[in-house]
């Protein structure tokens, strides 16, 4: 008797084919391979996803901070998010708005409380309301973890940040998450 060979994909193959377009290309930048001072320059982003640079470069500071601090500038170049080092109260996140020909006064990012320590590496999705940052403290798996929150336009504050979870966080330090949607 002849064996009948099915050309119809199995349910598993159909599921795989339907899920494949949703996969993301993930790049890990290992701190053992890339040194601290050039870390931010190794993150490839399309212009539509904004720009990342060191705090010292953005603010034209010659003196290095004790910790590498970063600034995220949105795709339109009219908003910047950054953490500022505060050894007494812990780092805080701030936002600047471009007003005509210069940056306006800094505004503290509201909604991220003192449960987060050594906040750093902000990144805002192109939707303009989803913020990622790195911090130690509340709900950390180990060392620095990636947290995410969204902006509530009614209250003018961000919602309570949530740990972004595995596989983006680990028991080691996880510093930065940038999502290039383009």
Where are these regions (language model features)?
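Short, conserved micro-motifs composed of acidic
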Residues: 2-182
């Amino acid at each position: 008797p002849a064996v009948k060979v099915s050309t119809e994909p199995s349910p598993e193959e159909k599921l795989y084919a339907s899920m494949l377009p949703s996969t993301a290309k993930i790049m890990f930048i290992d701190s053992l391979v890339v040194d601290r001072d050039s870390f931010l320059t190794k993150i490839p982003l399309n212009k539509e996803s904004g720009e990342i640079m060191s705090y010292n470069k953005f603010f034209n500071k010659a003196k290095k901070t004790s910790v590498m601090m970063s600034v995220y500038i949105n795709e339109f170049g009219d908003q910047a998010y950054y953490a500022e080092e505060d050894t007494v109260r812990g780092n805080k996140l701030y936002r600047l708005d471009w007003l005509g020909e210069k940056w306006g006064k800094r505004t503290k990012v509201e909604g991220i409380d003192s449960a987060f320590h050594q906040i750093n590496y902000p990144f805002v999705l192109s939707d303009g309301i989803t913020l990622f940052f790195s911090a130690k403290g509340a709900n950390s798996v180990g060392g620095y973890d990636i947290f995410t929150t969204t902006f509530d336009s009614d209250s003018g504050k961000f919602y309570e940040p949530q740990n972004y979870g595995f596989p983006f966080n680990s028991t080691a330090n996880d510093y930065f998450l940038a999502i290039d949607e383009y």
